[in-house]
Amino acid sequence: WQGPDRRISRFLLWAVDTRELGQQRALLGMLASLAEGEQCAVYAHALLEHEAAAPTGSERRLVTWSHLFDWVAHYIEAFQRHTVAVMPPEEMLLLRGFLGVLATVVRYSPATRDALFSHKAYAPLERLFALYACAVPMDLKAALLRAMAAFATQTGTGASPRILSALWDNLDQSGAIRSVRGEPPRALYELEHIECVHGRYPGTHA
């Protein structure tokens, strides 16, 4: 993670600037693997918090927390505004990869978990639950559930009561586990009408 000068590795700083789709997917898989372990998760968090100044007219770096949560917010707005909104398959794959990095970092580092949870601009739980409530593909819903579940990881003295309370409140409001306005719980509806139909159960397994 670090070079001889104890700064973020130049290789990683170079890698996170990649713009090619296949390389971006591979990068996210690599970061999720490298982030396993508490200290490694802290390093990964530092890398994703690092916002290098982009040259004028160039795209923002893909792999930053701010990009991830802005991306999630974009699709929340798109799906809430248009019920027939569609997420391009390649973007769904990238977002699932990014959520995998988030889940790994949050699972292994209590300090990072608390920092992200408390970040008002990111509002991770609110945004993840809001996207989960949209009509997105089940494979993406499963990735969202795994990322949210990572915030409830038991470490040391246990999971943070603040985070557990926020998770439960968001879960309750999402309609995933209880009826809302007479409609069946979202998780039950998706199991019966989507997963059973296709013979695949990513959301249930998550």
Please give the residue ranges for each predicted region.
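Extended alpha-helical scaffold regions
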Residues: 1-206
